[in-house]
Structures are given as C-alpha cells and as structure tokens.
C-alpha cells in the first residue's frame, strides 16, 4: 500500500485533544499507524482461510478459552456484565448481530469520512473478513460483545476526547484474533498482562484519570498512551524500560560540577528515585513507567503490604452465613472471569460500588488490588477496637481519633504482643470505661431492644473475664453488634453507620459510650496515679506520665466502673482489702447515680432533664428528685455524707461483714436495690482512719497539698464510691461550682445542715431508709470536687512533675503522718533544696519567668559585653563564676541559665536583636528595660537602671547569696529534724536507696546519681562531692 507522507486526514471531534501536540509527532505517528495497519492487513489476507478453517475445526478448543486470550479481552467488567445479560438466547444474539454489524460499518464510515480509496478498499476487505468471522455460531457471544464494545468505545472516545491517533479498533482486534494461531495458554496460568488487558478500556468509560497534557509517553520511542496501563504493556512488549537503576546509581559518581540546569535536573531525578522505589526489593526508578513495568514483571506488587483485600478481621467478625453470601458476591480477581460472568444478578447490587471504583482509581495500577479493595473495603476499613466499618480512610481516622480507639489498640498490642484485632485487654478496658456503666443504666428497661442488646453484651463481657475465654465471646459480641445489618457490603452505604459514635441518640441513651475528652483525660490521670502509687516500673525517667499509656497488670477492666478505677496496693492495711470485692459485686442499679454527673459533663448543663430521665429508670421519682436536688443545691450538698455515716454506722458494719462473706456468691446474681444502696453506703461508712484509695481522690489530696490548700490528710469518707467520685470530680470541675478543699473533716460539719438535706424528699411515697442511703450516695458524689477546670490541667501537670517513683507520697504513708509533717513532706519533695529560695520556687518550662530573675540575667549579660577600640560592643560569654552566683541567688539551675544565654546569643546572631537588646549587629546596642521600657545606649547606665529596679547592686549579689544559703540550710535542718520520726516510713518507700545528699536530704540509688545531683542542682564541683554524700545505713 502506498505511503502517505505529508497528507493528514481531517480529524473527528474525538481527536481535538491531539491538536495540542507538535506537527512532526503527528506525522510520525500517522506513518507508523499506516505501516502497522498495512502489515496487519497483509497478514490477515494471507491468514484468512487458516483463520476460518481453524474456527470451524477447533471450536471445542476455543470454546473453553479464557476471555483474556480472546478478542474481547479489552472489555471492562461493566461491559462484560452487560454482555452476559444480553447474550442469553441465540435468536436474540442473531438479531442484534445484524444490527450491530450495520452500526459498526456506519461508525467506520463516519469516523473516517475522507480516507483515500486505498484505505476504503482495505477497510472493505477487513469488513468482509469480520463478517465472515462473526457469522460463525461459535463466535456469537464473543462477537456480539466485541462489536458492541467497539461501537461503545468509539462513542466514549468521541465523547471524552481521549482517543489517540496511533490506535485503530480494527487493527487492535485483528492483532487479538491473530493471537488465536499461537499455541493456547492454560487458563489456570494466565499471561502476565492478562489483568491489564482485561481492564484496558475501562478507564475510558468514566474518563481518564490523567487528562489534558499529562499523556503517558514512552521515553525511548515517544509513543503516547492514554493510560499508564497501556504504556506499561507497550514498554513490556518492546523492552523500552530500564530495570537496573540501582546498580547504575551506585556506579555513577554524584558530581555537581555541571551547568546549573543539568545539576538541578539530576537532583530532580534523584528525588524522583527516592520516591519511585519498589516497596518490596528497594530498587529505585527514574520514572513511574519503569517502576510499573518492574512491578508487573517481577510480580512484586503482590508482595507489597496491604495486597490482600480481605484481612483476617473478616474471618472472626463475620458470621459463617454472611461470609458465604459475601464470598458469592465478591468477584474473584480479574484474571478469572467466573466472578462476574457466572451470575448476572449481583450486577445491580454492586453497580454503585464498582462505578465508584472506576471513578476513583480507573484501574491505573494494572493489578487487581484496587478493584478488590473497593469490593471489600467494608472489611478493610474497620476499626479494630469496635468493628465499625467506614467508607474512607479519613472517616476511619476521624472515628479512631474521636473515640480514642487508636490509643487502646496500639497500647494493648505493644503491651501484650498479640494480634491487634481482638486484643481482649483493650476491648475490656474500652468496654468497662464506656459501655459498662452506660448500658447498665439502661438494663432495667427490657422493653427496648437496644437496652437488652447492651445488657447482653455487658453480661457477656463479665462472663468473659471470669471464664478466661475472651476470643470466642468477643467474636459472639461482634456478631451480636453486627446483626442489624443485612450485608457487609452494604455497611459503608448506610449513612447511620458512618458516625455511630457521634449521634445524639447514642449520647442520650448512653449505649455506645461516645468520645468524651474529659473521660479520656480522667482515664489517663487515673492510670497515671495508679502507676505512680504502685511504683510499677516503666521505660523512662517519667513513670507517672508514660504509665498513663500502659495497661496496669492488676486491673480487671471488664468489671464495672468502680473496680476499674479502684487500684489497691498489696501492702495496705488488712482492713482496706475488702473494698475490692465490694465493688466487684456492685450491681447494675447503683451505677446510674454515678453515671449522672458523668453524662452531665458530656452534654453540658442544658441537658439536665435528659440525664435525670436517663438515670431514673429503676426508681423514677426517687432518683430524678435526688439528682435534681443535688444539682440545685450543690453548694451545701458537700456536707451530708458524714452525717449519714454517723446516723447508721452499726447496720452498715454488719452489711460489711455480710459482703465479705457472700462476695463471691453474689457475683453472678443481680442484687436488689436496697442491698445495693446499702452496699454503696457501706463504703461511705467505713472506718474514718484508713485513707481513700481512689486514685483521683489521692490526686485531689496531693493537689491540695501542692497548692497549699490542705491542712488535713484525706480521709476515706470524703470520697466514698470510686465510680461516683471519679465522675463527680470532673463534673464539678466543669461546672466550676466550688473552689474549696474537700478535706474538711467530718467532725466540723453541722448536723442540722445535713439532716435538712437528707430528709428533703420525705414527702415522696418511698422508704426513707432507701431515700437516705441513696441521698448519701448522690451527695457523696458531689462532695469529691476539684478546683475549677481552668486550673485543673495545670495542677495535674504540676502534680505529675513531682511524682517520680522514689519520691511519691503514698496514701499508706500519708495516713500515718500528722498534717504538718505531711505538708513538710510534700514541700521537701518538691521545693526544699539548698539553691531554692522560699520566695522564688522553680516552676518548670511551662511557667513564665520571674521578672526579677530576668532583670538579673539581663544585667549580668550586659556587664559581660566588652568594648573594642573602635567603640563597638561585642558578645562575650558569662564565666562559670558569674553563672554560679546567679544560680545560688535565684535558684535557677546552671542548665537553665546556660540555655537562656545560648538563646539570647542565637537571637542576636540571627536577627541582630532580642527583647532587651537591639542593634547589636551594628556594634552600637540599644538596651531596653523590660519593666519600664526605658532605652539606654551604654551597658553601665542600663545596669545601674536595672539595679534600681532590683533594689540592690549586682556586686552585692554574692554576699546576699551566701546569706540566703545559710537561711535555706537552717530551714533544711529544721525540716530534717522534724522528719526524724517518720524516717522509718521513708525507709519503707526507698528500700533500694542507699546514698543521701546532705544538702537537701534526698536519697539516691547510687553514688553516681548523688554526684550528678550535686553538680546539676547544687552546682558543686566534683572535688567537693565526697563531703556532701552520706550512706543511709550509717544513719
């Protein structure tokens, strides 16, 4: 066939995008197209009889062929399903076949309207060949699908404007049909690119992902392709790719003595190679095309993490029946055509899912992963803690952040080293902290389905902890939770499922335990204080901070709220031990009062009525009234518990003994309200001597001591029930009702006040004893309070700072130390060291600087500047003597002073100025007073001005530091003499401490630790260390 050199045919609308390309490339591509189509036509002409003969003789062999080796292999899934729906009856096939052949010839005529006569004759020959092929009965199904898809594809091409000049449908089809002459490959081992070819045109249904100028071009022959898949096929067939980048890069020297542009190009290439790296073998590539060919050639895409579409979650979370349905509906990998062709009915069900997968991905990666991911994403994007499915990764991330499930999953996995999905400790911890109290509050309503479900799941959880079968029961519970949904594939499409932890209904009925920030803070602080008190080892120097993210070993998280919060030290007095079994058997009814303040925190004060309704299920009049009264009268209501304790001590003691005896039996039985309430009061009426072991109460007591508010040690009655006090503390702090210490002793409370409020609702037709005990419990919850919320976090931060293992004041110790000594104890642990003055206590990095300290530092810095002969001032460093003087006088550590100096120097070098000093880079500084904003030109005048603010001269600072030192040492000797009596207690705490610092009486495990302490804290040089260290045993 003669070659056309310069004459280009007029393009149809579908080719409008190509006009942006250069003229030479168009001509070159068209020449290649002519050569290819000519050679193909000649091949076809020579092979026509053979092809027909083969079709008639080898029909059985081709009937069993996979679609991937047939001319229909470029069909997308949707095309294939349409085809399978249309090709049911043979008469229907024959009717549509004639129509389609006419349509196809019309299309050909309309697409190439101005072709020369040679091309027309060539196309006529090919039309005759195809008519002959398609008339054969064995080809009816495939022929129909082929002709339909070609016409549809032409429609889509003209609509999207995304076809290319060097692609011709009949040439492509011919090359596919010529493949039938090759020896047939086995269906079980498909060709390397079968899945790629199967999806070849699917992206054109919904438009290409890469539109506009970002066409995929082969870098060696400049052939342009619409999709990366087509370019990858081309590169694999022609070998136009590089697979040895890593070896080349090692040999190539990296020299940048090139022109600037070349050097930047090489840098870009290196950056690309850092990104375009095979995740399996680590080879890096210059281009995305090379990487994709490498992945498909080596099958490394199968070994990349997350390749498997259905994780192990599905086998554990889905019931067998649902799993069978899911397996039937889930299409197999695109290589095998049975998944979508065998059954035409799943097509409408999964249509939206598959369409979205086309829109988002377009099968650009050439593998089956994306498609299977879309089909199975309800199983993949599933919270490993609670099993909820999500549509997108973003939704799953939001869910885990809001509910805090990421913390529980990761912490439990790192702790236990188990499979993440079903870690029972994390599951139980989450359930006991959120689900258990909430669902318990709904338990008395058997009429509502949600309440019964929750009750079932809660009892299941309790049974789980006792029978040691967490895996099976957890699976049952997951099944129970997922019973409501018809099919796992439908889950992400259900709008109510996406935000199941944020809906108002769930917050109201409390069945899901929503994501509450205060609750998570409370859990964190609780665990932190537990770990600090127990002295459990941790992996860094800050046990109380990091311990918040560990699961305590002694905790049984699946028990109700009280037992989770309650952490009892084994070395406590014997009389304290019965508290644990009591709270293990605290029945379902007593929890709603503890829940009331908690839900109040969640929903803010406007929802008081809802909360009262919610927790009033068991005895509506009584509980609602008690809660509303406790809300309205929260000021005076902090007193009554003591009176209730005095009113009925004897029966409660008897109840105590009964509880000890029958604790184990009652675990499995729900207890009546009356006994449960008296159980609740049994804690309140416990002997006044032992301390409260509730961690948050301990936190409150140490907070009060730390802030100087407390004069008395914390006694047990002030915070009776762990569950109620835990919630009430944060409830009260959020409302900011009162800022007075909770430690006022029981004896000072007037009896009249408490009686007035105890019998306030005696007009109600209920038992007064029950009312009294209920009242005591609810007001008990109110009595355990904290300062307003704005101070709470900073106080907790300060509290955590002073909780290292060796220096934590334990509750057991504090109960035996008189109040004055306890206060001294806390001050000793926190502040009293030789360099700290009583006026200026160190607060740590978060606090603002003491202005006097800043003035001293600025004056010393200004005095260190020296003047050159030219009159310019230059920076110099403060010597160790000056730093020591500042440290001794201000109480700042040497490290803090060095950091301040380094920061000032850095700012001066970088910007030429800092807050109190400008124009330093020009050599003529201007000094600013931070107190009165005056300006000075010379250091001497600036220093004298600062001295006027300070009230003393800098040269007197040494003398004042010595006087201050003697004062502090006197105070230390006084404190240490006062501490002689509880020395035995300190010995109990610091069993492994062997050495002691003479200056501040702190004990250390090794001599090295004492020397470090002397250097850092007291600024003592190493030669003097020996005289300040003593052995604890010698004393």
Swiss-Prot record:
GO biological process, one term: regulation of transcription by RNA polymerase II
Compositionally skewed regions (Low complexity) per UniProt: 432-450, 968-977
Polar residues bias spans: 39-49, 66-92
Cellular compartment(s): Nucleus
Location (main, coarse): nucleus
InterPro entries, per database record: HD, Teashirt_fam, Znf_C2H2_type
Phosphoserine modification, residue list: 981
Chain's role: Probable transcriptional regulator involved in developmental processes. May act as a transcriptional repressor (Potential).
Assembly: Interacts (via homeobox domain) with APBB1 (via PID domain 1).
Name under which the protein is recorded: Teashirt homolog 2
UniProt source species: Sus scrofa
């Amino acid at each position: 066939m003669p070659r056309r050199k310069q004459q280009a045919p007029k393009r149809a609308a579908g080719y409008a995008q190509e006009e942006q390309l250069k003229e030479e490339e168009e001509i070159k591509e068209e020449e290649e197209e002519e050569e290819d189509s000519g050679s193909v036509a000649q091949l076809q002409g020579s092979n026509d009889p053979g092809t027909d003969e083969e079709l008639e003789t080898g029909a059985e062999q081709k009937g069993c062929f996979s679609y991937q080796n047939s001319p229909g292999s470029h069909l997308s899934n949707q095309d294939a399903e349409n085809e399978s729906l249309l090709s049911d009856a043979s008469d229907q096939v024959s009717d549509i076949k004639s129509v389609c052949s006419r349509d196809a010839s019309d299309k050909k005529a309309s697409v190439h309207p101005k072709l020369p006569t040679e091309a027309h004759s060539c196309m006529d020959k090919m039309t005759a060949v195809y008519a002959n092929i398609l008339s054969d009965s064995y080809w009816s199904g495939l022929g129909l699908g082929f002709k339909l898809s070609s016409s549809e594809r032409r429609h889509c091409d003209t609509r999207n404007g995304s076809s290319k000049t060097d692609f011709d449908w009949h040439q492509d089809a011919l090359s596919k049909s010529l493949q039938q002459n090759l020896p047939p490959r086995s269906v079980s081992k498909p060709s390397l690119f079968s899945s790629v070819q199967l999806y070849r045109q699917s992206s054109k249904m919904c438009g290409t992902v890469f539109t506009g100028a970002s066409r995929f071009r082969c870098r060696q022959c400049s052939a342009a392709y619409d999709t990366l898949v087509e370019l990858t096929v081309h590169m694999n067939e022609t070998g136009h790719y590089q697979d040895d980048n890593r070896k080349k890069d090692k040999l190539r020297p990296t020299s940048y003595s090139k022109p600037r542009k070349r050097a930047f190009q090489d840098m870009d290439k290196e950056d690309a190679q850092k990104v375009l790296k095979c995740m399996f073998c680590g080879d890096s590539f210059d281009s995305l095309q090379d990487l994709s060919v490498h992945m498909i050639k080596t099958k490394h895409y199968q070994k990349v993490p997350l390749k498997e579409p259905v994780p192990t979650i599905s086998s554990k979370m889905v019931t067998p029946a649902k799993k069978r349905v899911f397996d039937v509906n889930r299409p197999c990998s695109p290589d095998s055509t049975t998944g979508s062709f065998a059954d035409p009915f799943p097509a409408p069900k999964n249509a939206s899912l598959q369409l979205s997968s086309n829109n988002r991905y377009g099968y650009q990666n050439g593998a089956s992963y994306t498609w299977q991911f879309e089909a199975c994403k309800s199983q993949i994007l599933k919270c490993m803690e609670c099993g909820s499915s999500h549509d997108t990764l973003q939704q799953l991330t939001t869910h885990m952040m809001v509910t805090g499930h990421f913390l529980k999953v990761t912490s439990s996995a790192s702790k236990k080293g188990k499979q993440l999905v079903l870690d029972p400790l994390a599951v139980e911890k989450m359930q006991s902290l959120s689900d258990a109290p909430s669902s318990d509050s709904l338990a008395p309503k058997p009429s509502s389905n949600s309440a019964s479900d929750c009750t079932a799941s809660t009892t299941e959880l309790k049974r789980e902890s006792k029978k040691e079968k967490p895996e099976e029961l957890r699976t049952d519970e997951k099944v129970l939770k997922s019973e409501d949904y018809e099919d796992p594939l439908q889950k992400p499409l259900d709008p109510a499922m996406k935000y199941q932890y944020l809906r108002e209904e769930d917050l109201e009925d409390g069945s899901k335990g929503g994501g509450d920030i205060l609750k998570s803070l409370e859990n964190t602080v609780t665990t932190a204080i537990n770990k600090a008190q127990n002295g459990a080892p941790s992996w860094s120097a800050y046990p109380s901070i990091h311990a918040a993210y560990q699961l305590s070993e002694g905790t049984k998280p699946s028990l109700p709220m009280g037992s989770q919060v309650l952490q009892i030290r084994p070395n406590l007095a014997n009389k304290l031990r019965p508290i644990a079994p009591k709270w293990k058997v605290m029945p379902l009814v007593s929890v709603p009062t503890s829940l009331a303040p908690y839900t109040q925190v969640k929903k803010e004060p406007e929802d008081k009525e809802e909360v009262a309704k919610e927790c009033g299920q068991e005895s509506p009049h009584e509980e609602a009234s008690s809660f509303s009264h406790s809300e309205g009268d929260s000021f005076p209501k902090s007193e009554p518990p003591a009176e209730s304790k005095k009113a009925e001590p004897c029966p409660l003691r008897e109840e105590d003994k009964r509880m000890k005896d029958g604790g184990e039996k009652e675990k499995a039985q729900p207890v009546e309200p009356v006994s449960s309430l008296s159980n609740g009061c049994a804690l309140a009426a416990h002997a006044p001597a032992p301390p409260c072991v509730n961690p948050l109460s301990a936190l409150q007591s140490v907070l009060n001591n730390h802030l100087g508010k407390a004069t008395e040690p914390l006694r047990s009655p002030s915070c009776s029930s762990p569950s109620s006090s835990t919630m009430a503390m944060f409830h009260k702090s959020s409302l900011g009702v009162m800022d007075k210490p909770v430690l006022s002793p029981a004896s000072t409370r007037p009896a009249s006040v408490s009686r007035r409020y105890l019998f306030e609702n005696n007009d109600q037709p209920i038992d007064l004893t029950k009312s009294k005990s209920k009242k005591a419990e609810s007001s008990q919850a109110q009595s355990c309070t904290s300062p307003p919320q704005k101070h709470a976090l900073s106080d907790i931060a300060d509290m955590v700072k002073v909780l290292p293992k060796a220096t934590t004041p334990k509750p057991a110790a504090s109960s035996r130390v008189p109040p004055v000594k306890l206060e001294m104890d806390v001050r000793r642990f926190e502040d009293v060291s030789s360099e700290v003055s009583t006026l200026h206590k160190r607060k740590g990095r978060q606090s603002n600087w003491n202005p006097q300290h800043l003035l001293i530092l600025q004056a010393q810095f200004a005095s260190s500047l020296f003047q050159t002969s030219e009159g310019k001032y230059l920076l110099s460093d403060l010597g160790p003597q000056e730093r020591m003087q500042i440290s001794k006088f201000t109480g700042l550590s040497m490290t803090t002073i060095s950091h301040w100096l380094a920061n000032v120097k850095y700012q001066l070098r970088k910007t030429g100025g800092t807050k109190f000093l400008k124009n330093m880079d020009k050599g003529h500084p201007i000094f600013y007073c931070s107190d009165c904003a005056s300006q000075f030109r010379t250091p001497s005048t600036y220093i004298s001005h600062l001295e006027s603010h300070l009230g003393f001269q800098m040269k007197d600072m040494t003398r004042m530091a010595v006087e201050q030192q003697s004062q502090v040492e006197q105070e230390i000797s006084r404190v240490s003499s006062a501490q002689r009596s509880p020395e035995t207690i300190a010995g109990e705490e610091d069993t492994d401490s062997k050495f002691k610092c003479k200056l501040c009486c702190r004990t250390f495990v090794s001599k090295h630790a004492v020397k470090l302490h002397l250097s850092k804290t007291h600024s003592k040089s190493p030669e003097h260390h020996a005289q300040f260290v003593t052995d604890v045993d010698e004393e």
